[in-house]
């Protein structure tokens, strides 16, 4: 996928008519070969820039949902893809859908046609569509896949929105502190110093801090810059990402949010693949391919290894230490009763509802702590600012 380039061409068809079009090709040479196969004599070729934002998961899920609707209405797969290509507002999506329709006309299975486009359609898409092809229920598999992707996206957006709240509050508090340190407090201190009396210890300490931060601000900026570079370099190391994720999961409330989001994703995809008839190991592989966090990828790899060595599913989950006793009990019951897909779906619903509720209540849960922290900092600065005024009467009477 990364090597493919999008080209706009203008040429003459075999019957002598002028025609325009767009094609994906890995090079100009391969583009010319593809046009030759279509009996097109190119007159001009232009490479088109690719907008990576168009490959977001919500775009892919929307296309799959629309395709499922067309299949349900009785259109063939190639007809549905061709119709979607005509109606899609994005040029690169039009070219992609036309390419898939062309592959189908050449006798290539839809699931195999998606293989070169794993950046757009992850392995989960390919596995579900392959299952739909084998069972003759492609429309149902596409509907279920689109529903799962939409629900997962809504949960992810909800968690991100909830986590932004404390960050915004703390950022505003820092801005207020900086403004008071560098603009307000020095003015009060200058007025008080005209009386030639020493500043109160609290005010003097904060003024010293303000002077230091002003004098050595370049050093603080340099330190922040170096810290950002170090973090960027560390983010490329899987070992650091694993340690970082473990630490984040230990943070109260926020850790529960992040864990709930990941467990919802895991159980939702496993329930989806199980109900479609895909083996559990293949389902775990589909989950692993959708994960971007090395820590959870490591856990899923461990689960795959344990199950491959003959351990029951519930025990493989238990060995990771990230699944609650409720998860283990329901999975164990599902294994024993043959209703694993139902139990996985129940777990997905359970974690989704709990995580959504926690995200909705995050502001109320964090508000007391945030108020104490920000109120304590700003309150200390206000006291330091007005302490000299409280002592002003003593200073003036001393002068008298």
Swiss-Prot record:
It is found in: Cell inner membrane. Signal peptide: none annotated. One of its GO terms (biological process) is protein secretion by the type II secretion system. Keywords: Cell inner membrane, Cell membrane, Membrane, Transmembrane, Transmembrane helix, Transport. Pfam families: T2SSF. GO terms for cellular component: plasma membrane. The chain crosses the membrane at residues 165-185, 209-229, 370-390. The keyword RNA-binding does not apply. It is a multi-pass membrane protein. Disulfide bonds: none annotated. PANTHER family: GENERAL SECRETION PATHWAY PROTEIN, PROTEIN TRANSPORT PROTEIN HOFC HOMOLOG. NCBIfam families: PRK10573.1. Belongs to the GSP F family. This is Protein transport protein HofC homolog. It comes from Escherichia coli (strain K12). The gene is hofC.
